[in-house]
Amino acid sequence: MEPGRNINNLGGFYFMQEKQKKNVTTILKAAGSVVAVAAAAFLILVLVLTVTEFKPDSKETLDVGGNASGTLHEGDDFSIVTWNIGYGALGANADFFMDGGKHVSTADRKQVQTNIQAISGELKTLEPDAAFLQEVDLDSKRSHGINEQDAIVGEWKDSTYSFATNYKVLYVPYPIPTIGKVDCGILTLSGYEMENAERISLPCPFSYPVRIANLKRCLMVDRIPVEDSDRELVLVNLHLEAYDDGEGKAAQTKMLKQVLQDEVDKGNYVIAGGDFNQSFSNVDISMYPQISEDLWHPGCVDVDEFGSDLNFVTDNRTPSCRSLDQPYEGADPDHFQYYLIDGFIVSSNLTVDSVETQDLGFANSDHNPVLMKVTLGE
């Protein structure tokens, strides 16, 4: 063996080691730079979302739009529907990641338009005197920027309406792909003149920073004067907490109870309705069992806590909501997770004549509309 060659080989070995060290160092620096840029971008995003966070007051006066010629009297019949329309993107084809499904984007623009048109058409067919709608988008990525309020209100002639925002985020940064921009709320329509509308903030169960990209739930209170009477028909549209540990629902339900009781104590007629994300303890839901603990399951309102002045009303013959862990299209309807979480609370001076959940096969929303007819007591 030649000594010179051994020395040359040894030198080459050291040279290669140094080169590898430099390469590793370069890679680590590059990776560190990427992490630093990502961290900086995340912090900037959190800062922007913090500055632009939707922070409604505890009570806010809302605009009432439109014109209605109808007048209400004691002894009159009154019909009302509640419907969570799933921002026009949760039809029978949809599943959703928050319920165990796979998708964030659940409908293209054409599908959203088709769903909203069908929902508007069904409302015209039902011809209620008033409607409580939830998950109505004004300008959201998930519904392709369509103003669903304008689309629906445009089909209601001779009516008044009010809108309360409960979800407004410049950019929701999760999951991947992200939810993105959301501008959404609850909409009340009436064939009678509504004198005023008010947004009442409900307790938010989420702390910072999760709170900044989450819903800010509320009640929307509208008032219809009753002719030749000092009473009002008070309409309360609601959409209570869904994805919490249960404490949020409880706190919001407690506040709802107080708001309704205050109106009852004034002698007013009261109808509260919407998506409670809870069943009612006075309603048999055994026909809709929890088929898997892995799926979302609702809370339960103890109706006895509301006393005898307020009655809970829904129709258990048809489910009001379906799970979004899988599409409804192509699934076995006999082995599907259903819920009964939409309905009404009415004051005892109203006689409930009927309540019926419309079985629409969840074609255009993951909820079915619930129609109730009452008579105002004299």
Residues covered by each model-derived region:
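N-terminal, active-site-proximal structural segment of metallo-dependent hydrolase catalytic domains
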Residues: 17-150, 154-155, 163-174, 178-183, ...
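A well-ordered secondary-structure block
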Residues: 168-233, 237
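Metal-dependent phosphoesterases centered on the DNase I-like endonuclease/exonuclease/phosphatase
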Residues: 244-348
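Active-site beta-strand/loop signature of hydrolases that rely on acidic residues for catalysis
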Residues: 79-85, 116-145, 189, 222-224, ...
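Conserved beta strand-loop-helix elements of the APE1-like EEP
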Residues: 154-157, 181-197, 223-225, 332-351, ...
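Solvent-exposed loop/turn segments at secondary-structure junctions
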Residues: 87-88, 137-140, 166-170, 194-195, ...
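Positively charged N-terminal leader segments that act as targeting/secretion signals
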Residues: 2-13
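Surface-exposed cleft-lining segments at the edges of enzyme active sites
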Residues: 102-108, 136-138, 203-211, 239-247
